[in-house]
Amino acid sequence: MSFADTLAQALAAPGRQAIPFTDHEGDATRPLVLHTYRPAQATPDSPVVLVQHGMMRNGDDYRDFWIPAADKHGLLIVAPNFDNANYPGAEVYNNGHVLAADSTVRPRAEWGYAVPERVFHWLRKAGVTRREKAYFYGHSAGGQFGHRMASTQPLDIFEAIAVGNPGWYTLPTLEKTFPEGLGGIGLGEAELLRLLAFPLLILAGEQDIETSGPSLPAQPEAVAQGPHRFARAKNYLAAGQAEAARRGVACNWTLVQVPHIGHDGDVISRVAASLWFDRTMPDDATLAGWAKGRGSAL
């Protein structure tokens, strides 16, 4: 059975699924699992949301964060899971395994950032979707993954990309080497202009302000971007605006500051869903209610 047939069969009925996926166009030695949810009313014309987990490698949880929105709006949710055994550490997951252990640049087809586009192409090949574009959401380490994906990959298949609370950012400059910047990995001015032109959505919890902890990147390049994730989000937008101004072009990014909310992948998922599919920001009282009694959700 081809993988297209496997997908079509698994997603023929509503509900949750966990579908093993070997990316033969990329690094076939590192399998993944696609955690999916299809509501009963979903059709091949329904929006597709690709969801990227954080450092806990919990794609099943991140899929579940999106189930209320999926049920409300008829969304197909697909959350690729990069497990710790096959994608150990930040270099192989957050940083896309762009660089080998000896710091040489790996083949571009094997970068982790190419996986979401190939997953979406398989969904189309399987007839699961007729949509030409997908939504992408990533939080925390998944937000690191997401903005680096937007920095390095063709963006034709993305309707929208939202990144929530990344720990630090790859700055939109060729003058700093990857992952601090985009230099040294075969990218050029065209890719940088493409990134600046894309309507990237940056979601930043106003209470994501811890200045130390095991999940907060603390290398000098990260600390230079600000003391905490909230400050680093604002620094990233400012860097994009400055690089665009230098070139006389627009920076089409948007930073949405989320009141009351800290490092919470569930609530930031709800905010992204509301902005995309309800076309509105949740009101202050709703956000305050969501914040009560919550800790971090990685």
Describe every region a protein language model picked out:
Residues 83-110, 215-216:
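Cap/lid segment of the alpha/beta-hydrolase catalytic domain
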Residues 159-246:
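The feature captures the conserved acid-bearing segment of alpha/beta-hydrolase catalytic domains
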Residues 50-52, 164, 258:
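Alpha/beta-hydrolase
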Residues 267-276:
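Post-His helix in hydrolase/transferase enzymes
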Residues 258-264:
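Histidine-bearing beta->alpha loop at or near hydrolase active sites
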Residues 53, 138-148:
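Glycine-rich nucleophile elbow surrounding the catalytic serine of serine-hydrolase chemistry
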Residues 1-48, 58-61, 72, 104, ...:
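A domain-start/cap signature at the N-terminus of enzymes
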Residues 42-88, 170-171, 210:
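Short substrate-entry loop that stabilizes the transition state in hydrolases
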